[in-house]
């Protein structure tokens, strides 16, 4: 028998009798509490709160921390909601607080500009997601290219992914890849995807994307599937995972970070996060900030059921209060019309149409939804 000297390697035994080594995912966990979570507090985080959350997340081992107005860089506006601070103040708070996690931000072409991207980079942002509606990847080319020129990690973020069939979504992902994206996400902005829907979209991605291009999942919990959909995504090739403390995010929130990490531990996946630290920050810091519970309830469940952009929730609730409607009726009509992110201003139009449609019996309802509200005249 020939002996092997130290340092000499051999090819792995691939004989049929030897079971294959199980694949263990090594996840890139990105926290979105300080960006998507802005929606849950009407974009009102204080700078000190941002600093506290970022410090705790960094200590708990997440790979990246996303920070911006809920609608991305330059999102602060009457249409989307005025932020308590500028993006730059929040970003400076985060970049000054982290030593290991990658400071990240989000940019929606048409809201944020290349100038905004450059300013974010100057303040320490090193990764960016360029977000478009799921059928409009072509408008991301300039911003993805600019991010690459700055030496940033850049991902494409295809929002409302339930509105495009798997093959079409994959075609859009291929466009983002061609512009230079290192990663492309399935972004379930409406919390509408089921586990089968998630599986089919990631399989479609794998059919067309270069193996070197990463894929990621951004789930919302409107149907109660945030963790389950994220698990299915990882099982079908996703390496980047979005989640937030206590699920803090638009609608019923995002995939709850601490719950997902617990599941990932049970499944033996690598993630680098410290579970108890995440639990403590979720319960002691984040939950007390909520002026409206982030949970699956009749309004947020309607978001997922009707396939409505999750950040429409607070806008629809305000319109319902103003015009004496059931929030669910507004959301169901918004879903029927296929409204997408950026059309927040049209929610009032929907409410006025529903008021005009009200019958003489004092019942305000969307004929399509079958949901009624009592007469509040």
UniProtKB/Swiss-Prot annotation:
Its EC number is 4.1.3.39. Substrate binds at residues 35-36, 189, 218, 309. It is an enzyme of class 4 (lyase). This is 4-hydroxy-2-oxovalerate aldolase 1. Residues 27-279 form the Pyruvate carboxyltransferase domain. It comes from Parafrankia sp. (strain EAN1pec). Residues 1-13 have a biased composition (Polar residues). GO terms for biological process: catabolic process; L-leucine biosynthetic process. GO terms for molecular function: 2-isopropylmalate synthase activity; 4-hydroxy-2-oxovalerate aldolase activity; manganese ion binding. PROSITE patterns: PYR_CT (PS50991). The record marks 35 as: Transition state stabilizer. Belongs to the 4-hydroxy-2-oxovalerate aldolase family. It catalyses: (S)-4-hydroxy-2-oxopentanoate = acetaldehyde + pyruvate. The active site is at 39 (proton acceptor).
